[in-house]
Curated annotation (Swiss-Prot):
Location relative to the cell: Cellular thylakoid membrane
Membrane topology: Peripheral membrane protein
One cellular-component annotation, GO: phycobilisome
Region (Disordered): 224-246
Gene Ontology process terms (BP): photosynthesis
Species classification: Bacteria, Bacillati, Cyanobacteriota, Cyanophyceae, Acaryochloridales
Pfam families: PBS_linker_poly
Gene (name only): cpcG2
Ranges of compositional bias, category Polar residues: 235-246
Record PROSITE patterns: PBS_LINKER
Quaternary structure annotation from Swiss-Prot or TrEMBL: The phycobilisome is a hemidiscoidal structure that is composed of two distinct substructures: a core complex and a number of rods radiating from the core.
Gene3D superfamilies: Phycobilisome linker domain
InterPro entries for this protein: PBS_linker_dom (IPR001297), PBS_linker_sf (IPR038255)
Function comment: Rod-core linker protein required for attachment of phycocyanin to allophycocyanin in cores of phycobilisomes.
Protein name according to UniProt: Phycobilisome rod-core linker polypeptide CpcG2
Length: 246
């Protein structure tokens, strides 16, 4: 039996208030499949989707999903389903889902899939319980199929951060994992700032003493380097040679 979603009150955020800003260089670019006229536009849309979901500016080969890209390029699936497939991919699970707590997964999912931050701690708690009961796959389907996603992005637009005009972009303040996972990795990596690491390393070094072999100089044969014979060819040096003077 699925636990019903806990109720929470939305807070006032920029995307919930009508805005009349003049578009500028800070305005996010909207990548839509309806505006794609050639393959280069499709490639830019795919790159924007990877950047939005994985929050990485460089798309790694291990991150890419060729089958999803092929289906999107052939218009066999919508952008909504492409975003869904990226968020439910095994790569995303390994890099993001397995390295974060449920509370932070809620924050990451809302920012990358709905383009907004959590309203409050009550919303984080409510969705974290949903992840614990239904799993990550079902949680992604709930967000992507929600009315909020449909009203803001529809089927053919890549999600983006809605109405950002002051704060830094989400992809700059929401790294792949937080201090929770970083502290967990502290036990398995070298920490250069701890003096105890140097002491333990020094104690673990095994020094093999050098065995010096005594040598007697009584029987050392020194070769004779004195010249006993005169050269047969006389030296061709003329002491009366003169040199031009300026």
């Amino acid at each position: 039996m699925t636990i019903p979603l806990l109720s929470y009150a939305p807070s006032s955020q920029n995307q919930r208030v009508a805005g009349y800003e003049v578009p500028n260089e800070e305005t996010p670019w909207r990548y839509s499949l309806e505006d794609a006229v050639d393959q280069s536009d499709i490639d830019e849309l795919i790159w924007a989707a990877y950047r939005q979901v994985f929050s990485e500016h460089v798309v790694l080969k291990s991150t890419r999903q060729p089958h999803l890209e092929s289906q999107l390029a052939n218009r066999a699936i919508s952008v909504r389903d492409f975003i869904r497939g990226l968020a439910k991919s095994e790569t995303f699970r390994r890099l993001v889902v397995e390295t974060n707590s449920n509370y932070r997964l809620v924050e990451i999912a809302l920012k990358r899939l709905l383009g907004r931050a959590p309203y409050n701690k009550q919303e984080e708690l409510a969705w974290s319980i949903r992840i614990a009961t239904d799993g990550w796959q079902k949680f992604v389907d709930t967000l992507v199929d929600s009315d909020e996603y449909t009203q803001n992005f529809g089927d053919n637009t890549v999600p983006y951060q809605r109405r950002r005009y002051k704060d830094r972009p989400f992809n700059l303040v929401t790294p792949r994992y937080s201090d929770y996972w970083r502290d967990k990795l502290e036990n398995s990596r070298y920490k250069w700032g701890d003096i105890r690491n140097f002491l333990e390393m020094a104690r673990s070094v095994k020094v093999t003493p050098v065995q010096f072999k005594p040598v007697s100089t009584a029987n050392v044969q020194i070769p004779d380097t004195t010249r006993r014979d005169r050269p047969t060819v006389p030296a061709s040096i003329n002491p009366t040679a003169s040199f031009p003077l300026r």
